[in-house]
């Protein structure tokens, strides 16, 4: 059963380029699923290497030439590098801002019924402090960049996917060499 008339989408074979499919209710036996612009671009679901009609994040940002693809590659590469650098910068800023140290002592049972005092170091910071506000703004920027990189990768354009991976790898190589290898459970992009 052919469902190509649904939502104004047309299906492509392996030799097609992505072109918008125009759905005209007066000339088709299909039905409408809502308002708005009824023309949509069919997103490829396999990796491809091309530079014609490649939308990059926004509908007005369309790559049509090899030069535009090269420029997009460099921009995406730098964005992915910046993302990795931002992660390390945030960690460094967090370590530097944690200067408020408190020592808490509590009794613990010792050998032969004696009581020992155990001291714990607590590092804290205030919610409305400048370092915390800066970390919050940088976190928002990091989340937005990570989603941009994810959406760029989801174009399935091989050149752009390579730019994301190569930029992230280069950024990690350049910025993370001093960092201890620890799994970050708050990672957004990987």
Curated annotation (Swiss-Prot):
Residues 1-35 are annotated as: Disordered. The record marks 42-43 as: Cleavage. Changing residue 156 to A: Dramatically affects copper(1+) transport activity. InterPro entries: Cop_transporter. Residues 83-132, 178-190 are cytoplasmic. Copper(1+) transport is stimulated by extracellular acidic pH and high potassium ions concentrations. Copper(1+) import is regulated by a copper(1+)-dependent recycling of SLC31A1. A motif (Methionine segments (Mets) motif) lies at residues 7-12. Homotrimer; is stabilized by cisplatin via interactions between cisplatin and the methionine-rich clusters, and could be crucial for the copper(2+) reduction process and copper(1+) stabilization. Heterotrimer between SLC31A1, CCS and SOD1; this heterotrimer is copper(1+)-mediated and its maintenance is regulated through SOD1 activation. Interacts with KDR; this interaction is induced upon VEGFA stimulation leading to SLC31A1 and KDR subsequent co-internalization to early endosomes, thereby activating KDR downstream signaling in endothelial cells. This is High affinity copper uptake protein 1. It comes from Homo sapiens. The lineage of its organism: Eukaryota, Metazoa, Chordata, Craniata, Vertebrata.
């Amino acid at each position: 059963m052919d469902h190509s008339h649904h939502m104004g989408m047309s299906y492509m074979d392996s030799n097609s380029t992505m072109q918008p499919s125009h759905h005209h209710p007066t000339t088709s036996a299909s039905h409408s699923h809502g308002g708005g612009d009824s023309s949509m671009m069919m997103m490829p679901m396999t990796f491809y290497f091309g530079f014609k009609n490649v939308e990059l994040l926004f509908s007005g940002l369309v790559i049509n030439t090899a030069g535009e693809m090269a420029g997009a590659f460099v921009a995406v590469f730098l964005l992915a590098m910046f993302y990795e650098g931002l992660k390390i910068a945030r960690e460094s800023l967090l370590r530097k801002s944690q200067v408020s140290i408190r020592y808490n002592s509590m009794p613990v049972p010792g050998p032969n019924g004696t009581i020992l005092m155990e001291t714990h170091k607590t590092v804290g910071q205030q919610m409305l402090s400048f370092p915390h506000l800066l970390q919050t703004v940088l976190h928002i920027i990091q989340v937005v960049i990570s989603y941009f990189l994810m959406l760029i990768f989801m174009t399935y354009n091989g050149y752009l996917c390579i730019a994301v991976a190569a930029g992230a790898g280069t950024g990690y190589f350049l910025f993370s060499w001093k960092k201890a290898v620890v799994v970050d459970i708050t990672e957004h992009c990987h």
